[in-house]
Amino acid sequence: MSDSVVAVSASPVTPQTASAEKKVAAKKPASASASKAKKTTAPPTHPPTQQMVDASIQNLKERGGSSLLAIKKYISATYKCDAQKLAPFIKKYLKNSVANGKLIQTKGKGASGSFKLSASSKKEPKPKVSSVEKKSKKVTSSAAAAKKKTISATKKPKGVADKKLSKAVVTKKSVDKKKAEKAKAKDAKKVGTIKAKPTTAKAKSSAAKPKTPKPKTTSAKPKKVVAAASPKKAAAKKPKAKTASATKK
């Protein structure tokens, strides 16, 4: 009897455990699909409505102010988004900005009029950096600092090599200077020897100059002899004239 009672009590336990396991298994994929759906939600392709409305009013540059329709058209054309879905957010921002003094309502009441930027809002505020961007900047700055440290550590042996190269360059320069000085000394010696030669040539020419006047004295003497000989011929001709006069008598 006891065995049969145990068997009857054990039989209803098995279906309950099976159903519980099925429920747990069914809950797991549902939670996984929900987490995947959260991850796959794409970020917005346009900036917030505040920036879009301010940019539209600033770029339209209407004297009487920009109307709600003009703002919607500008947002849909430039940012390529559905302005009708964003209409309640645009109206809310227009009302709040008029109350805060950021916008000036030139016509109408509420969100149905025309709006202009105030003098304080015309100054373009700096865009707020999100916390994610700040963290990314910190990470990049720390990575850049680590890279600088590694670069500085690797550059130290290069400094030793640079010192060796500088020493080699200095030695080469000193050798080149010595060679240049030797070449200059050789050139100076050559110039000294070349300059000494003309002095000897001048001395020779000055010594040879006194010898030239001697032939002049010899050439002048025969002229005097010719001049002395000419009167003798004239004297010889005179006796012939006397004989002619004697014959005439």
From Swiss-Prot:
It comes from the Eukaryota. Residues 1-53, 105-249 are annotated as: Disordered. The keyword Nucleus applies. InterPro entries: H1/H5, Histone_H1/H5_H15, WH-like_DNA-bd_sf, WH_DNA-bd_sf. GO terms for molecular function: double-stranded DNA binding; nucleosomal DNA binding; structural constituent of chromatin. CDD domains: H15. Disulfide bonds: none annotated. Keywords: Chromosome, DNA-binding, Nucleus. It is found in: Nucleus; Chromosome. Residues 146-158, 234-249 have a biased composition (Basic residues). Gene3D superfamilies: Winged helix-like DNA-binding domain superfamily/Winged helix DNA-binding domain. Residues 121-134, 173-190 have a biased composition (Basic and acidic residues). Residues 45-119 form the H15 domain. GO terms for cellular component: nucleosome; nucleus. Pfam families: Linker_histone. One of its GO terms (biological process) is chromosome condensation. Residues 1-19, 27-43, 195-233 have a biased composition (Low complexity). Histones H1 are necessary for the condensation of nucleosome chains into higher-order structures. Belongs to the histone H1/H5 family. PANTHER family: H15 DOMAIN-CONTAINING PROTEIN-RELATED, HISTONE H1. This is Histone H1. It comes from Drosophila hydei. The gene is His1.
